């Protein structure tokens, strides 16, 4: 089917060839035929079958691809950097990019950044041929350079460490950056991406939990930077909103919920692998049990957090910061089928939800294409096959980490920073079977009780230092609590 662009009084409308236009109207049209495109201009009118015909006064000029990109007839591919490309988020991002590019060339992978997985990075480089490769661990930097020599006619810019990450963030050839680095380490790359006015597809909830007010300050300074949530629940909330309203503001800004008419958020959770266990059974679970998530395939840290439901607690704080929603208006709901990922109740009390199978490719894709959507070949949702959707409230007795997260969030100040840091230590101790299930919440609770509120620095640089110091203090305190308990 031929496609045209009509320009009336300097306004552009994209349409197809059977649109009725007024007889003898002055118009300019772009006609696409196979691999060629032409611009027609002059006096156009409808034929008897309502198809566009051209009078003798029309002229035609052949266009090149660059002309079409410049006027918007063909969209320029989105240039993407993926930080943590060998992790769960990174590999999912590359999977959906690969599949979408089979339909239409939508994405260019411009940069890949990993911690130390040199062989996996090499394989990704062979396929996607990015302009930049960066490895954080300097000890394998030379190995990466030698491996890349095996790729014929490929000469990327090979970087390492934080300096390499900063160079990628500052590149003018990159439009969007996927932050798939977990834990507090992801904050650095998020910060530098914002400082370079990038659109950040953020999967690192710890950045927002630990430094939400710092990121808000940065986003106010760097006006063109945006954070688009990748977490399935927060992507679901974001997808439920009216883009016309979203475009008037951005995530992590005051009055976001007011502008978007948000009244309440229902934050959905699978419940994790321990949802049906008794208190006595929970006392004896191991990390091996926790890593068997019933629905999602994720990294170890987030899978443990899902089992304790601390992941949902962190997401409550993330929801508060991202969408400017009061903690009393965020409700956690266990939805074991994982079809509805979250719901938004608006001020008129209507509720909109986003639904799909538990698959991170959808939220990752939306974070890259927003405010648009593109065609995919993903499996369509079959509601008849799903059949039943269930919901219930989680037990705070069985999952005390949720309660701790609400308490830390409501206290504000640096309590979410302390919560996140102490959880990193407790999570790792449980992962290595050094503590029991309920010891996780016990350690976190003791660290929170030991912390005293501090005055928040006004200067952005000083505030970042303050967050780092408190994060380090909380990790040390959690480790100290474990060591004292272990030695007694």
Swiss-Prot record:
Mn(2+) binds at residues 231, 233, 315. NADP(+) binds at residues 86-89, 115-117, 206, 299. Transmembrane segments: none annotated. Mg(2+) binds at residues 231, 233, 315. Inhibited by fosmidomycin and its derivative FT900098. Binds 1 divalent cation per subunit. Mg(2+) or Mn(2+). It is an enzyme of class 1 (oxidoreductase). Residues 1-72 form a transit peptide. SUPFAM superfamilies: 1-deoxy-D-xylulose-5-phosphate reductoisomerase, C-terminal domain, Glyceraldehyde-3-phosphate dehydrogenase-like, C-terminal domain, NAD(P)-binding Rossmann-fold domains. It is found in: Plastid, Apicoplast. GO terms for cellular component: apicoplast. One of its GO terms (biological process) is isopentenyl diphosphate biosynthetic process, methylerythritol 4-phosphate pathway involved in terpenoid biosynthetic process. One of its GO terms (molecular function) is NADPH binding. Catalyzes the NADPH-dependent rearrangement and reduction of 1-deoxy-D-xylulose-5-phosphate (DXP) to 2-C-methyl-D-erythritol 4-phosphate (MEP). This is 1-deoxy-D-xylulose 5-phosphate reductoisomerase, apicoplastic.
């Amino acid at each position: 089917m031929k496609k045209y662009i009509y320009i009336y009084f300097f306004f552009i409308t994209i349409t197809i060839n059977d649109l009725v236009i007024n007889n003898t109207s002055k118009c300019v049209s772009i006609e696409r035929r196979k691999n060629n495109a032409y611009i027609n201009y002059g006096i156009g009118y409808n034929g008897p079958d309502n198809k566009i015909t051209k009078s003798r006064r029309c002229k035609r000029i052949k266009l090149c691809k660059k002309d079409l990109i410049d006027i918007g007839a063909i969209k320029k591919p989105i240039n993407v950097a993926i930080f943590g490309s060998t992790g769960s988020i990174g590999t999912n991002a590359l999977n959906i990019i690969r599949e979408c590019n089979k339909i239409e060339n939508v994405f260019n992978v411009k940069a890949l950044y990993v911690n130390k997985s040199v062989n996996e990075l090499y394989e990704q480089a062979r396929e996607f041929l990015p302009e930049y490769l960066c490895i954080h661990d300097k000890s394998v930097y030379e190995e990466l350079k030698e491996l890349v020599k095996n790729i014929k006619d490929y000469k990327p810019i090979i970087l390492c460490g934080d300096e390499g990450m900063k160079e990628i963030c500052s590149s003018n050839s990159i439009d969007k950056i996927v932050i798939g680095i977990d834990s507090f380490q992801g904050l650095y790359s998020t910060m530098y991406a914002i400082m370079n006015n990038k659109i950040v597809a953020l999967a690192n909830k710890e950045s927002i939990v630990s430094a939400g007010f710092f990121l808000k300050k940065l986003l106010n300074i760097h006006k063109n930077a945006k954070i688009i949530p990748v977490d399935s629940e927060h992507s679901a909330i974001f997808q439920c909103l009216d883009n016309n309203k979203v475009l008037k503001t951005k995530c992590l800004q005051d009055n976001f919920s007011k502008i978007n008419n948000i009244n309440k958020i229902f934050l959905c959770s699978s419940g994790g692998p321990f949802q049906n266990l008794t208190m006595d059974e929970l006392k004896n679970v191991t990390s091996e049990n926790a890593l068997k998530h019933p629905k999602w395939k994720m990294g170890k840290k987030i899978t443990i957090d899902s089992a304790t439901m601390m992941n949902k607690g962190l997401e409550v704080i993330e929801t508060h910061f991202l969408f400017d929603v009061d903690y009393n208006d965020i409700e956690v709901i266990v939805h074991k089928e994982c079809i509805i990922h979250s719901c938004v109740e608006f001020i008129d009390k209507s509720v909109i939800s986003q639904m799909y199978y538990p698959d991170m490719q959808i939220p990752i894709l939306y974070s890259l294409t927003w405010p648009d959507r593109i065609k995919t070949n993903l499996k369509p949702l079959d509601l008849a096959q799903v059949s039943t959707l269930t919901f219930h409230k989680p037990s705070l007795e069985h999952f005390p980490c949720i309660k701790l997260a609400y308490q830390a969030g409501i206290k504000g100040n640096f309590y979410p920073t302390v919560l996140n840091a102490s959880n990193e230590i407790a999570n790792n101790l449980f992962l290595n079977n050094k503590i029991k299930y309920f010891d996780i919440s016990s350690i976190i609770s003791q660290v929170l009780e030991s912390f005293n509120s501090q005055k928040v620095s006004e200067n952005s640089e000083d505030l970042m230092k303050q967050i780092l110091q408190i994060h380090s203090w909380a990790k040390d305190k959690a480790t100290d609590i474990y060591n004292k308990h272990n030695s007694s």
